[in-house]
Amino acid sequence: MSSVRALLAPVLAAVQVALGRLTTSISMKENISKLRAYKWSRVDRFKYGAMFVLAFFSITVISEPPLPWKLIVPILYTLALLFPISSQFILPSSPILLWLLLFYACRFISPSTRPHIWVSVLPTLETIWYGANISDILTRFGHPLLDILAWIPYGVIHFVAPFVVAALLFVYAPPGTVKVFASTFGFTNLVGVLVQIAFPSSPPWYELREGITPANYSMRGSPAGLARIDALFHGHGYTIGFTNAPVVFGAFPSLHAATATCEALFMSYFFPIKAKVGRWYVDTRILYWCY
């Protein structure tokens, strides 16, 4: 028991120090004074201007929930920025919140204004680069053990890792690191969604199911191999989630790859810890496995 306490003592001390850096002020005057004193650079004007345009576009396009209910989102966001106790979390997370807002709004963009869906580009590039259709080859042999091995990083760690990485950076990395991570994480995914809107491309499951027949925006998504996980655990979570996904034709760029890369880079930079496994040296870049 004493050994456990000895191990937890430095962790609890680090958490206590990190929590001590947080503000508990609820004074709106404090944030308003900071805003008035802030000197806006050209980069700030461009960044927040572009974010405002994208947020305005998203709120305008969204039809469910309708007016006035959808205005609750910007109202709550504005109120959260006014109080120091909440703005210290909301402001750095703004790129992430904007990415999620735009991602949700994609389902409401009129198909008549959207570009052509590219069905054969990615399979062709895959064949050129790898000499074969890797997606097709990987689906020829299946086993529940392989499904679980693929599901853990793709369907579980992918959604949990950002919070774990942010918590570790908050406790052990220099002050302000989490803000940089949140901005990088959010803008990376935000740019990814913008590319997906401008260059919609079909995912591997589409070729396996539909071939290279032309796609349209009325088609619904598919859980692909994750449907076997639903069947294995007698659930419907992945089937419902991916079938109703706002972005169906967003195979490029892969947001799974984006988040895994972002997490691996931050972790390997701030925690350059290596472990020897046989002849191999493994460090925190193994998070890229989440892709």
Question: How should these model regions be labeled?
Answer:
Residues 2-73, 83-163:
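N-terminal transmembrane-helix/juxtamembrane module of multi-pass inner/ER membrane proteins
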Residues 255, 262-270, 274-291:
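Membrane-water interface signatures at transmembrane helix termini and the short loops
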